[in-house]
Amino acid sequence: MKYTALTLLIGFIYFQAVAQHSMQGYISDEKTGERLIGCSVHILGTTEGVTSNNYGFYSIKINKLPAWVVFSYIGYQTDTVEFVPAGNNIDVMLSQKTSNLKEVEIRATSAATSTPRTGVLTIPVQQIKQLPALGGEVDVMKAFQLMPGVQGGSEGTSGLYVRGGTPDQNLILLDDIPLYYVNHIGGFISVFDVNAINDIKLIKGGFPARYGGRLSSVVDIRMKTGNSSEIKGEYGIGLLASRIFIEGPVLKKEKTKFMFSLRRCNLDIATRLITRMQSGLVFSAGYTFYDLYSKITHEIDSDNSISFSFYNGRDNIFFKQRDPVAAGSDTFFDYQANIIWGNTLASVKWNHQYNKNVFGTLTFAYTHFKYLNRVQYEEKYKSDKEVIEKASTSFVSGVNDVILKKDFDYFVSNTISL
């Protein structure tokens, strides 16, 4: 035991001694200020490199000066920055790349970045938006069904069968918080609105310890934090659903920003109208769902930031009917049945950069899944609608999680991070 501890101590001192300088900071989108997750950072002319963490933070060790550090990210122009020892964070802004169809050059270059993790699949959100969609609704979960080692279930459904597992064996995380049953319409559409998502990755094997034990896979999804420079938004009305998305700064520019996204199914509008017309306004039935995302992020200073995330989604199958108790009777009864299910998530996070090598996140969160099967009956007078008799039956099932955790990212060297 003593020899093991001594070996670990010597190794720790070695890594600290070898790295004479350290360059750290945040990587963001130049136009929106959105943090770039998994951005490649490497020293020009060497094979040493790292990637930014889930909050866009990077830390790279530099052993020899002068040195130039290269930042590259899919869909963005590569940027090269000369390292100047200063001790402060060096934040980098990358601009999105425009497609120019010119000649193709093939050059041999040295391996430049850290070795990618085995079993981790990442698809840029912009590429997901270009995939074919069911009813105009792009589904981030279906995008992974096109990847090796992943299969879909029944035709058109969004469930993930990873290496022989089943969808219920996957851990689904939204901003590090678990969600349960993430499908609408019996599995044809997932609850994830692509407009509200910044980054998504699928881990098929070799799960890090922070995810716990899972049989199949881990789907790690990160919400957008919002545009830090200007208020922007978009809306759309589709065959299946309508949506609205707004993001921008609040209060002091670039310090506090927000993101809001709402998607609602349109099916119930048609079914309500058709069933009421056919029944003479005494019967209506249908199905609807909605997904609401919101997030507020405030940067306290260069080392601290706090954010609040919220998600609420519901599915509702409903049936309503009104009939007289008997022919010629002055009383009638109202009958209503609902099957409702969905998730609610709320979390508060505090991000703190302890030093040039250590980044920490404190999370307090609540997540809830609810399934409700309810039947209601009321007997009333036609004249004043006074309730004569009332009865209801409900079946409720759910899961509640209260989470308090502290995570650390320790950049030991350019090849080791904990």
Language-model features and meaning:
Residues S28-T32, C39-L44, W68, S72-Y76, ...:
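Short, acidic, small-residue-rich periplasmic hinge/interaction motif at the N-terminus
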Residues F188-S190, N198-P208, S217-G248, F260-R264, ...:
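Short strand-turn segments of transmembrane beta-barrel domains in outer membranes
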Residues Q77, A111-D168, L174-F207, K224-T225, ...:
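Periplasmic N-terminal accessory/gating domains of Gram-negative outer-membrane beta-barrel systems
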Residues S305-Q353, H368-G398:
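Flexible loop and strand-edge segments within Gram-negative outer membrane beta-barrel domains
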Residues D91, M141, G159, D199, ...:
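Membrane-embedded beta-strand positions in outer-membrane beta-barrel channels/transporters
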Residues A111-T113, P167, L179, K224, ...:
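Structural signature of outer-membrane beta-barrel domains
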Residues G238-R264, S279-I317, W341-Y366, V412-S413:
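Transmembrane beta-barrel wall of Gram-negative outer-membrane proteins
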Residues T47-F57:
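Short, acidic Ser/Thr/Gly-rich low-complexity loop/linker segments typical of extracellular
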